């Protein structure tokens, strides 16, 4: 009886592992965070479906370890009508990414990262109490809060525009991210950032 021949594969010729593409389409490894202060807080861990089952919610500030796309999805759920509807929010972001790629021919994750960098305020105001009088004081914004504020402004823009427009939420989100990535002051999120910084500048 002839023995089956088994050829050992050379160590250097190992089969390459397939990358985890977001929504089986977008390569996260192509994206670079250009703002040095945000590198630590914009998480780009490759995932197919951005869903962590709440494992980052048990410890304070642990959300910095959550993929940035999932943080946007979670923020879109924080309305009275969309609470808990993660499948709906994932669908909105997935469709928005398709539209961004169709309009710009770019990786939509890269557009999202640029939009966050352009919409996160670098300074804001706090209220200090002196002898019973509240006095506004300008302070630098922490990098994690910059990311939080940016995602919040983008999500807020989608909520407000969806009430006034017949366009689907995915199209509104796509337009907002494209405009924010270019730093367009006419878009809601960039306008909110500039308003925060203008108030902080007057309180220096």
Swiss-Prot record:
Per the record, its GO cellular-component terms are: small ribosomal subunit
Query: What is the similarity comment for this entry?
Result: Belongs to the universal ribosomal protein uS7 family.
Give the domain of life: Archaea
Q: Does the keyword Ribonucleoprotein apply?
A: yes
Q: What Gene Ontology molecular-function terms does this entry list?
A: rRNA binding; structural constituent of ribosome
Its quaternary structure? Answer: Part of the 30S ribosomal subunit.
Tell me which InterPro entries the record gives: Ribosomal_uS7, Ribosomal_uS7_arc, Ribosomal_uS7_CS, Ribosomal_uS7_dom, Ribosomal_uS7_dom_sf, Ribosomal_uS7_euk/arc
What job does the chain carry out? One of the primary rRNA binding proteins, it binds directly to 16S rRNA where it nucleates assembly of the head domain of the 30S subunit. Is located at the subunit interface close to the decoding center.
Kindly list any coiled-coil regions of this protein: none
Q: Which UniProt keywords apply?
A: Ribonucleoprotein, Ribosomal protein, RNA-binding, rRNA-binding
Give the matching HAMAP family. Answer: Ribosomal_uS7_A
Q: Which GO terms describe its biological process?
A: translation
Which CDD domains would you find in this protein's record?
uS7_Eukaryote
Q: Which PROSITE patterns match?
A: RIBOSOMAL_S7 (PS00052)
Name by which UniProt lists this protein: Small ribosomal subunit protein uS7
User: Does Zinc count among this protein's keywords?
Assistant: no
Gene3D superfamilies found in the cross-reference section: Ribosomal protein S7 domain
